[in-house]
C-alpha cells in the first residue's frame, strides 16, 4: 500500500480505470503518508480525513454501479487555500480570513467536482499569495521535501510540497508573478501558468487581477495536460476568460527538436548560481546536439520586470484588499471609536507584515501626484514587455531559460531583505506581465541534491506547442528527477 503514493499521475489514472486500484485504497495511502510526513513539511493547513474518505467511497460506488463521472473519477487533488470551496474555510493563509467559510465553489472547483476528483483542500501559501517561500503565511512555513531545512518556494509552496512529498499526485495553485513555476522548480515537479484568460479566476481570492492565473502542479506531464483541458474554457462569471479553441490533452505530442528555434538568454547577464548556470548550458548543448537552433534573445527589458511587476501588482492588491474591512466578513476588531477605527484596527490585526507593505506601496503609487510617475509609467513599460514577447515569437518557436536563479534557500535566509526575496522572481514576472503561458520543468539536481527547473514559454494560447516541447524535454536523461521517498 505504501508504494501507491509513489505512482505517477498517469499510472494512478490507468490503474483506477482498469479496476486494479480503488479510490478509497489510494486516498487512504495518501492520508497515511500525510500523517507520517506533514508534521515536517507543513503543506496542509487543515485536513478533514473523514470528508475526504467519503468522497473516495462515493467514487468507488459510482465505479461499481457503472455511473462514473469521467475517467478522472476518484483521483485525489490538492487545492491552494485561496480557491473557494463551498463549506470549506478559505483563509488565504491570513488571520483576517481565518474563520471565513466559503459559500460557493470557484469555477475550477465546480469543474473538478463534475469530473469526480477527490478534493484535498487547504494547502498552505504565502498570505494572499504575496511571497516566494510560504514564510509569509500567518500560520506556518511549508518545507521542501528534498531538504526540510529549506523553503519549497511560493506563494503556492504548500501545493508544490504536497506533490513533491508524494502526499498527492496533482494539485492546484495560482500564479501572479511566478507562484506556480518557482515552487515547481524548487521542488522538482511540473508547474504550469496558462495564458491569462485561459482558465477562469471566478472564486480565486484576488491579489492582482490582471496578473493572477490558476494552474496545475503534477508529478508527471500528463497530469498537467489533463488538468489544463478540464480547467480551461470561457466562463460567464469571469469576463476576462477568452473565446479560444478548447485545449485538448490528447493533441499534445512530443516535438522533434530538429530545426526548431529555441530562444535563449545570456547567462552572464544574470546572477545565476553556478549549478543552475551549468545545468542550463548543459541542456542547451544537448538540444543543439539534437538539431535545435539556439537563438540568443535581447532580454534587456527583463531588468525592468521586477519594478514594473511590483508597482502594478501592489496597486491592484491595494484595491482588491480594501474589501477586507471588518464589516461584511473576516476578522472584526470591536472598538468604541469611529468606523474608521474599526477599519484600522481590523486590518492592522488581520494583515501580516508583507501584505501591509504591499498595500502601502500600492496605495502610494496610486495616490495623487504619484500616479503618473509610478503606476502610469509601469503600465507603459508593461506594454513594451508584451510587445517584446510578441517580437520574440516572430523568430523563435519557444523560449527556454532557468525558472529560478538559484535552488531552494534555507528557511529564514532572506526574510530580512525583501528586495532580495523579490529578485527570486526575476525570471518569472515578465511572463505574467505579458500574459503568455509558461511551464516549469524538472531539470535534474544540483551538487547538494536540490532540484533545478527550467522554464519554457510560448505565445498566447499556444499551450499545445508549449506542452509538446515540455513533453520532449521530459524525455532527456539530463532532466530526470526522482522524488524523495524519505523526508529528512
UniProtKB/Swiss-Prot annotation:
Compositionally biased tracts (Polar residues): 136-145
GO cellular component, one term: glutamyl-tRNA(Gln) amidotransferase complex
EC top class named in words: ligase
One of the record's GO molecular function terms: glutaminyl-tRNA synthase (glutamine-hydrolyzing) activity
Record's keyword terms, sorted: ATP-binding, Ligase, Nucleotide-binding, Protein biosynthesis
Active-site residues, Swiss-Prot/TrEMBL: 80 (charge relay system), 155 (charge relay system), 179 (acyl-ester intermediate)
Enzyme Commission designation: 6.3.5.7
Listed InterPro entries: Amidase (IPR000120), Amidase_CS (IPR020556), Amidase_dom (IPR023631), AS_sf (IPR036928), GatA (IPR004412)
BP GO terms, sorted: translation
Catalytic activity as recorded in UniProt: L-glutamyl-tRNA(Gln) + L-glutamine + ATP + H2O = L-glutaminyl-tRNA(Gln) + L-glutamate + ADP + phosphate + H(+)
Region annotation Disordered: where it falls in the sequence: 136-158
Gene3D superfamilies: Amidase signature (AS) domain
Family: Belongs to the amidase family. GatA subfamily.
Function statement: Allows the formation of correctly charged Gln-tRNA(Gln) through the transamidation of misacylated Glu-tRNA(Gln) in organisms which lack glutaminyl-tRNA synthetase. The reaction takes place in the presence of glutamine and ATP through an activated gamma-phospho-Glu-tRNA(Gln).
Assembly and oligomerization: Heterotrimer of A, B and C subunits.
The protein, known as: Glutamyl-tRNA(Gln) amidotransferase subunit A
Species whose genome carries this gene: Leptospira biflexa serovar Patoc (strain Patoc 1 / ATCC 23582 / Paris)
Gene name linked to the record: gatA
Amino acid at each position: 500500500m505504501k508504494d501507491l503514493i509513489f505512482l505517477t499521475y498517469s499510472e494512478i489514472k490507468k490503474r483506477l480505470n482498469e479496476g486494479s486500484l480503488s479510490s478509497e485504497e489510494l486516498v487512504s495511502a495518501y492520508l497515511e503518508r500525510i500523517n507520517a510526513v506533514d508534521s515536517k513539511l507543513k503543506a496542509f493547513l487543515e485536513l478533514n480525513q473523514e470528508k475526504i474518505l467519503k468522497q473516495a467511497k462515493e467514487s468507488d460506488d459510482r465505479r461499481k454501479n457503472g455511473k462514473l463521472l469521467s475517467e478522472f473519477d476518484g483521483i485525489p487533488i490538492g487545492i491552494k487555500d485561496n480557491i473557494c470551496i463551498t463549506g470549506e474555510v478559505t483563509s488565504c493563509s491570513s488571520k483576517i480570513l481565518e474563520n471565513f467559510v466559503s459559500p460557493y465553489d470557484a469555477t475550477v472547483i465546480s469543474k473538478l467536482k463534475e469530473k469526480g476528483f477527490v478534493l484535498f483542500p487547504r494547502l498552505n501559501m504565502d498570505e494572499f499569495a504575496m511571497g516566494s517561500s510560504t514564510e509569509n503565511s500567518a500560520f506556518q512555513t511549508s518545507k521542501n521535501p528534498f531538504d526540510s531545512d529549506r523553503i519549497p518556494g511560493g506563494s503556492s509552496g504548500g501545493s508544490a510540497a504536497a506533490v513533491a512529498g508524494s502526499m498527492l499526485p496533482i494539485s492546484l495553485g495560482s500564479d501572479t508573478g511566478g507562484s506556480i513555476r518557482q515552487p515547481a522548480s524548487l521542488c522538482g515537479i511540473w508547474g504550469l501558468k496558462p495564458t491569462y484568460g485561459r482558465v477562469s479566476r471566478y472564486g480565486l481570492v484576488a491579489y492582482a487581477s490582471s496578473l493572477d492565473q490558476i494552474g496545475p502542479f503534477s508529478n508527471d506531464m500528463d497530469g498537467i495536460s489533463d488538468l489544463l483541458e478540464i480547467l480551461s474554457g470561457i466562463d460567464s462569471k469571469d469576463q476576462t476568460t477568452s473565446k479560444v479553441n478548447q485545449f485538448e490533452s490528447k493533441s499534445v505530442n512530443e516535438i522533434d527538436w530538429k530545426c526548431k528555434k529555441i530562444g535563449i538568454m545570456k547567462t552572464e547577464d544574470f546572477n545565476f548560481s553556478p549549478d543552475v548556470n551549468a545545468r542550463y548550458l548543459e541542456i542547451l548543448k544537448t538540444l543543439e546536439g539534437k538539431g535545435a537552433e539556439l537563438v540568443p534573445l535581447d532580454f534587456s527589458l527583463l531588468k525592468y520586470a521586477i519594478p514594473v511587476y511590483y508597482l502594478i501588482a501592489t496597486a491592484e492588491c491595494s484595491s482588491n484588499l480594501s474589501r477586507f474591512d471588518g464589516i461584511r466578513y473576516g476578522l472584526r476588531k470591536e472598538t468604541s471609536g469611529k468606523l474608521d477605527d474599526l477599519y484600522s484596527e481590523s486590518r492592522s490585526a488581520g494583515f501580516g507584515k508583507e501584505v501591509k507593505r504591499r498595500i502601502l506601496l500600492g496605495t502610494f503609487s496610486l495616490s495623487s501626484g504619484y500616479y503618473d510617475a509610478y503606476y502610469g509609467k509601469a503600465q507603459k513599460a508593461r506594454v513594451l514587455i508584451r510587445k517584446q514577447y510578441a517580437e520574440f515569437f516572430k523568430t523563435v518557436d519557444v523560449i527556454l531559460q532557468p525558472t529560478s536563479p538559484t535552488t531552494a534557500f534555507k528557511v529564514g535566509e532572506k526574510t530580512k531583505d525583501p528586495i532580495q526575496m523579490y529578485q527570486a522572481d526575476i525570471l518569472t514576472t515578465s511572463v505574467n506581465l505579458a500574459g503568455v503561458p509558461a511551464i516549469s520543468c524538472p531539470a535534474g539536481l544540483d551538487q547538494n541534491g536540490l532540484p533545478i527547473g527550467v522554464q519554457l514559454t510560448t505565445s498566447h494560447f499556444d499551450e499545445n506547442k508549449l506542452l509538446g516541447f515540455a513533453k520532449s524535454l521530459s524525455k532527456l536523461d539530463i532532466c530526470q528527477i526522482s522524488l524523495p521517498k524519505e523526508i529528512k
